[in-house]
């Protein structure tokens, strides 16, 4: 999922636990085939990658940010950190956990070539410190912590897709049906993301809210010859649609005929 637009840009219905660690490399190649370059930065959960894969990302020049599993030896290392080594970082967010304490250091991993930057962060509302590892040695500790924290927003959007499109309950064990479900879910998510950006006051609306208030509106479809008119019936939230930026669109696969909306 794209961190800025929160649009789901990649999905794989055939992913299993056995091959999930390499999927980040598959995505990197997919992104390069579309854009001509590897993604500049990948923020990921530690469960979907390995140290060897992180090394390969570094070799390809891709910046990564992920968590490190808290092993017994790592917890012992954290316990031995002197009090004077911790420094306070002020995060740009509201709430009780906006001033965590951080230890910024270099460390080695058993299956990672060279060293990696490690941020040990205490005071984020968890019992044990959060340990972030990255090959980004340019950004400040504050920037890296905030960047990783935005992953929670992405997970929230995925939870919305699960709730709205039942993304975790695909239709069938038949691969064709599953792939179709995933493609339709990606398209539906993109359509909802585009719609909410056009509706005043609904920039953060969830797909199920859009469905209830706008998409389930009844109406009539009129074939005008050189275009199609969709006339929607009046509802409580019709004024929001009237003021929305929904332009008349020429549809290529309709031979250039237009699609436009009107409201009773």
Write out the residue ranges for each language-model feature.
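Flexible loop/turn segments at secondary-structure boundaries
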Residues: 7, 17-19, 48-52, 72-76, ...
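An acidic- and aromatic-residue-enriched active-site/binding cleft used to recognize and process polar
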Residues: 3, 13-16, 45-47, 53, ...
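Electropositive, glycine- and tryptophan-enriched low-complexity nucleic-acid-binding patches
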Residues: 1-35
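Short, surface-exposed connector motifs at secondary-structure boundaries
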Residues: 33-41, 59-60
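Short, conserved catalytic/metal-binding motifs centered on acidic residues
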Residues: 6, 24, 39-49, 64-65, ...
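Short, solvent-exposed helix-loop connector elements
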Residues: 141-148, 164-180, 195-207, 226-234
């Amino acid at each position: 999922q794209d961190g800025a637009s929160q649009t789901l840009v990649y999905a794989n219905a055939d992913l299993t636990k056995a091959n999930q660690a390499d999927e980040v490399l598959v995505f990197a190649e997919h992104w390069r085939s579309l854009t001509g370059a590897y993604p500049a930065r990948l923020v990921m959960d530690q469960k979907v990658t390995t140290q060897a894969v992180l090394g390969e990302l570094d070799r390809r020049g891709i910046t990564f940010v992920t968590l490190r599993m808290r092993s017994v030896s790592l917890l012992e290392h954290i316990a031995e950190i002197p009090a004077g080594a911790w420094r306070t970082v002020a995060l740009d967010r509201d709430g009780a956990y906006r001033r965590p304490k951080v230890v910024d250091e270099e460390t080695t991993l058993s299956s990672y070539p060279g060293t990696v930057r490690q941020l040990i962060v205490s005071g984020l509302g968890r019992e044990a410190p959060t340990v972030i590892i990255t090959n980004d040695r340019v950004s400040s500790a504050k920037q890296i912590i905030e960047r990783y924290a935005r992953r929670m927003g992405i997970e929230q959007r995925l939870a919305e897709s699960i709730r709205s499109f039942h993304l975790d309950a695909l239709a069938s064990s038949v691969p064709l049906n599953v792939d179709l479900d995933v493609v339709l879910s990606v398209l539906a998510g993109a359509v909802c993301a585009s719609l909410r950006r056009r509706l005043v006051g609904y920039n953060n609306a969830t797909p199920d809210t859009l469905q209830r208030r706008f998409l389930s509106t009844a109406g009539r479809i009129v074939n005008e010859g050189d275009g199609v008119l969709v006339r929607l019936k009046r509802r409580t939230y019709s004024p929001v649609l009237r003021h929305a930026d929904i332009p008349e669109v020429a549809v290529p696969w309709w031979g250039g005929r237009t699609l436009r909306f009107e409201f009773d």
